[in-house]
């Protein structure tokens, strides 16, 4: 009869993340984000104690780059001690340097995988329950497959613990690359992977799993972040329960003004948004609220923050006036001339756009500021100007 046990699989805590840009512009918010990283660790500890798990796996990037300070090292060591159950740790490309290993040692219940693949036996009730195999990064630019020498075992349920990049994962880098077919061929029952900041069960039976990072740090890491509670009965995974650890959500939201006549109708689209979330808002559609959106996007951001108790990190205005621009292009009147001229400017070169925008003495004095804008931002300025003129002319004709 096979063994039965429960464990937590987590990864990419990035303890010590500094949020430098946010901290310099909004110190209180920066401190809140820094604290959220440690709150995610606390949530893992609480879940481990609540569920009385048999062990916990940390699949790399526990610390953020060189930010394994005495404080972060101590906080993690204390967390391992509080868990009490065995903890299996591999280090990744961000935390391969371990500066305080001798002066701030981990507790005895922690096992840190070395740079070469090793196996560890997990014994429960005096019987072999699982074999856990893994390795840590030796530097931050490892481009070799760390799983090459891994072999599973028919002796017991086998878990592979690695910080690696699976093919077609969507990552820009190719650190520690491996491929799915290779993993599936190794007689390993559960691959506990880290590195990809996106939660994904890549394959079942055998399981190939990325839990994602424990707390989102930007809009690329949106929605709920957490870890997996895994139940194994008689050497078979019977339950995979995701649980949230990150206290702060990053959300991308699109709000449509089409058919809306009142700002309250726009705000109603935000019902149910969790208080304290970080929001990137895109206003889209066509309607009478276009003018307000373009004239005062900052005011709309502040209104959204007031109503939702969230932080708006960015607001993009992609709305249009409540007229059919395509149809008006063909009318041959002054309004169609404005629309057509605006369309031509949008396709102009950056140099031509700059010359047009900086054609007055006042604008020329601000040219260095305009030079900081991207090509798309310059085109958005032209687009906004076109839409504003169209709206003013349309209102005047009523």
Predicted regions and their residues:
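Conserved beta-strand termini and adjacent loop/short-helix elements that scaffold enzyme active sites
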Residues: 10, 90, 113-115, 135, ...
């Amino acid at each position: 009869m096979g063994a039965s046990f429960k464990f937590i699989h987590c990864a990419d805590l990035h303890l010590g993340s500094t949020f430098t840009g946010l901290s310099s512009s909004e110190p209180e918010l920066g401190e809140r984000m820094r604290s959220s990283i440690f709150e995610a660790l606390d949530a893992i500890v609480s879940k481990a104690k609540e569920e009385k798990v048999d062990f916990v796996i940390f699949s790399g990037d526990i610390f953020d780059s060189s930010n394994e300070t005495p404080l972060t090292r101590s906080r993690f060591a204390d967390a391992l001690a509080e868990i009490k159950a065995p903890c299996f740790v591999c280090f990744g490309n961000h935390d391969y340097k371990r500066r305080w290993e001798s002066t701030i040692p981990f507790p005895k219940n922690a096992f840190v995988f070395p740079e070469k693949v090793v196996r560890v036996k997990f014994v429960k009730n005096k019987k072999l329950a699982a074999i856990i195999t893994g390795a840590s990064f030796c530097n931050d630019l490892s481009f070799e497959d760390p799983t090459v020498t891994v072999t599973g075992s028919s002796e017991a349920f086998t878990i592979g613990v690695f910080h690696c990049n699976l093919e077609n994962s969507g990552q820009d880098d190719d650190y520690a690359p491996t491929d799915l077919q290779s993993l599936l061929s190794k007689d390993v029952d559960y691959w506990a992977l880290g590195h990809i900041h996106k939660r994904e069960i890549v394959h079942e039976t055998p399981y190939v799993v990325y839990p994602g990072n424990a707390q989102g740090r930007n809009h690329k890491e949106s929605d709920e972040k957490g870890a997996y509670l895994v139940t194994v009965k008689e050497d078979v995974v019977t339950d995979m329960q995701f649980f949230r650890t990150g206290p702060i959500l990053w959300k991308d939201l699109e709000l449509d003004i089409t058919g809306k006549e009142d700002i309250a109708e726009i705000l109603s689209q935000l019902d149910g948004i969790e208080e304290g979330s970080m929001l990137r808002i895109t206003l889209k559609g066509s309607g009478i609220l276009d003018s307000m959106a373009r004239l005062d996007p900052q005011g709309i951001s502040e209104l959204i923050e007031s109503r939702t108790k969230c932080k708006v990190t960015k607001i993009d205005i992609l709305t249009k006036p409540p007229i059919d621009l395509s149809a008006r292009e063909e009318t041959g009147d002054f309004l169609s001339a404005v629309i057509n001229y605006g369309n031509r400017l949008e396709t102009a070169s950056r140099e031509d756009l700059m010359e047009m925008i900086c054609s007055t003495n006042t604008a020329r004095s601000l040219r260095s500021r305009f030079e900081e804008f991207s090509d798309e931002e310059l085109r958005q300025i032209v687009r906004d100007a076109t839409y504003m003129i169209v709206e003013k002319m349309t209102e005047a004709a009523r």
